[in-house]
């Protein structure tokens, strides 16, 4: 098997195996080939990982932020040196095209290590508060053992987005990747050890639905950060709430992307395509409800159809390929069921909706699909599909489209395309979403906070704001005179 790791888990600085765990097969989505076979963590493996993290964390927390940051910056250097190797592994693990992974996956993980490694000394500070003769000061202190639970769309990036702020803040982490994409996080753990990270601080264990509760409910875990679906997020948040654990939830969305009639048409179409077809549509922040002002609807659709049908679909390891397969057969079948619902409920199929002709029969491919004449009540306009399916809806005016855009349980992202920047900012203020883009879409540099509102989650990944979710504030009051007591 061409991507078989040394063992299933990485604990306390070394690979660990326990063949008693349920078998997890990593499948290359383009061909159906089994590229690795691993085992889910047994309760004993979970205990071993958490114990290693708990043992290593206090000494790590006692180091200066500068010293911790230096190690993370070295890890970033190593990731960049091995970008090709890591990108090919990510492509095998997920099915995403190499032309995408080589610029967007390990590189964004390296950016995260570099950013947090550099910003920590200045960001992990407190305040001095004069109180007359007395004074107080505050300091940010680490939480302890943190659990990261990843999704299968950006496995290496998510491991770094959670690991970097947790580690630089002085915590230890046990990270569980998705069972669909188990390989990349193991390489991140290897690189961190090579960069000088003390053993036990970043542990990776494999698992399935039975593993998550063992981690979330463990009494030594102080924090859980999840990237996943809304139903999973509710279960994890509920379990964490029972023990008052800290949580960050980055969940799903059904985000609106609004195109006004004065927008640059090519840019708006490009933004809509990036917000629906990048990573084969498997991006939580995708703008899958594309509201197009009625005046430009048909020109928009005509050009969108032309550009969509020119997308190169094929072998993800071919650098000419622009769109790869879905991550799994189960996800492909789920997306096809939504396409069927769109047709049945009266949406107009503009393009796509089937299997490409030029691909392996064992691959989990779907044509990029565009529906028009979609109405707000249709299933494809209400539920997260998580595949390359774009819904185009008509609108007439600003007030109407804002109300319709907000009429959803989700609130992860939103986008606005218009030449009128005054209107752009006004609309952005009124849209109920945690992350918004104006005249672009789905750009998430590490310098800016990323996260949602409503049922799309809470807390933020990236930027200095993320450090607040991996630390808590300690206040110290210093008395400078005798204590006055009425006793």
UniProtKB/Swiss-Prot annotation:
Pathway, per record: Amine and polyamine biosynthesis; betaine biosynthesis via choline pathway; betaine from betaine aldehyde: step 1/1
Enzyme class: oxidoreductase
Top-rank lineage group of the source organism: Bacteria
UniProt xrefs under CDD domains: ALDH_F9_TMBADH
InterPro entries, per database record: Ald_DH/histidinol_DH, Ald_DH_C, Ald_DH_CS_CYS, Ald_DH_CS_GLU, Ald_DH_N, Aldehyde_DH_dom, BADH
The entry's keywords: Metal-binding, NAD, NADP, Oxidation, Oxidoreductase, Potassium
Cofactor binding note of this UniProt entry: Binds 2 potassium ions per subunit.
Stored Gene3D superfamilies: Aldehyde Dehydrogenase, Chain A, domain 1 (3.40.605.10), Aldehyde Dehydrogenase, Chain A, domain 2 (3.40.309.10)
Entry annotation: catalytic residues: 162 (charge relay system), 250 (proton acceptor), 284 (nucleophile), 461 (charge relay system)
Residues holding K(+) 1: 26-27, 93
Names of the cofactor(s): K(+)
Gene Ontology MF term list: betaine-aldehyde dehydrogenase (NAD+) activity; metal ion binding
Sites of Cysteine sulfenic acid (-SOH) modification: 284
Sites where the protein binds NAD(+): 150-152, 176-179, 229-232, 252, 284, 384
GO terms for biological process, alphabetical: glycine betaine biosynthetic process from choline
Reactions listed under catalytic activity: betaine aldehyde + NAD(+) + H2O = glycine betaine + NADH + 2 H(+)
Disulfide bonding pattern of the chain: none
Assigned EC number: 1.2.1.8
Subunit-structure text: Dimer of dimers.
PANTHER family listed in its UniProt record: ALDEHYDE DEHYDROGENASE-RELATED
Role of this protein: Involved in the biosynthesis of the osmoprotectant glycine betaine. Catalyzes the irreversible oxidation of betaine aldehyde to the corresponding acid.
UniProt xrefs under HAMAP family: BADH (MF_00804)
Protein name from the UniProt record: Betaine aldehyde dehydrogenase 1
Underlying gene: betB1
């Amino acid at each position: 098997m061409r991507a078989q790791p040394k063992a299933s888990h990485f604990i306390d600085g070394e690979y660990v195996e326990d063949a008693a765990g349920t078998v997890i097969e990593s499948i290359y989505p383009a061909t159906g080939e089994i590229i690795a076979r691993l085992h889910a963590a047994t309760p004993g493996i979970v205990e071993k990982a958490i114990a290693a993290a708990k043992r290593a964390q206090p000494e790590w927390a006692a180091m200066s932020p500068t010293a911790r940051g230096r190690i993370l910056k070295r890890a970033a250097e190593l990731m960049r040196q091995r970008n090709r190797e890591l990108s090919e592994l990510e492509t095998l693990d997920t099915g995403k095209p190499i032309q995408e992974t080589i610029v967007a996956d390990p590189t964004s993980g390296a950016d995260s290590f570099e950013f947090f490694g550099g910003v920590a000394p200045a960001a992990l500070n407190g305040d001095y508060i004069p109180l007359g003769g007395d004074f107080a000061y505050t300091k940010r202190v680490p939480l302890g053992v943190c659990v990261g639970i990843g999704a299968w769309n950006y496995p290496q990036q998510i491991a770094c987005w959670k690991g970097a702020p947790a580690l630089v803040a002085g915590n230890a982490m046990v990270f569980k990747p998705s069972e669909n994409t188990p390989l990349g996080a193991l390489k991140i753990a290897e690189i961190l050890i090579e960069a000088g990270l003390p053993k036990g601080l970043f542990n990776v264990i494999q698992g399935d639905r039975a593993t998550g509760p063992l981690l979330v409910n463990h009494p030594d875990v102080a924090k859980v950060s999840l990237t996943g679906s809304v139903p999973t997020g509710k279960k994890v948040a509920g379990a964490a709430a029972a023990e008052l654990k800290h949580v960050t939830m980055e969940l799903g969305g059904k985000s609106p992307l609004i195109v006004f009639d004065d927008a640059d048409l090519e840019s708006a179409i490009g933004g809509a395509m990036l917000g629906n077809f990048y990573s084969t549509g498997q991006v939580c922040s995708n703008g899958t409800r594309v509201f197009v002002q009625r005046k430009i609807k048909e020109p928009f659709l005509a050009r969108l159809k032309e550009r969509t049908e020119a997308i190169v679909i094929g072998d993800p390891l071919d650098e000419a390929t622009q769109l790869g397969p879905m991550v799994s057969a189960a996800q492909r079948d789920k997306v096809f069921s939504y396409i069927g619902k769109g047709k049945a409920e009266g949406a107009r199929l503009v393009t796509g909706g089937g299997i490409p002709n030029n691909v392996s029969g064992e691959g989990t491919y779907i044509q990029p699909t565009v529906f028009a004449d979609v109405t707000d009540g249709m299933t494809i306009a209400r539920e997260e599909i998580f595949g390359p399916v774009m819904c185009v809806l008509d609108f007439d005016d600003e007030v109407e489209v804002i109300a319709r855009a907000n009429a959803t349980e989700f609130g992860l992202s939103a986008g606005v395309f218009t030449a009128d920047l005054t209107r752009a900012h006004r609309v952005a203020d009124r849209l109920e979403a945690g992350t918004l883009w104006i005249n672009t879409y789905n750009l998430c540099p590490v310098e800016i906070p990323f996260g949602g509102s409503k049922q799309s989650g809470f807390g933020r990944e990236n930027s200095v704001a993320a450090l607040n979710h991996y630390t808590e504030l300690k206040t110290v009051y210093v008395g400078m005179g005798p204590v006055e007591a009425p006793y």
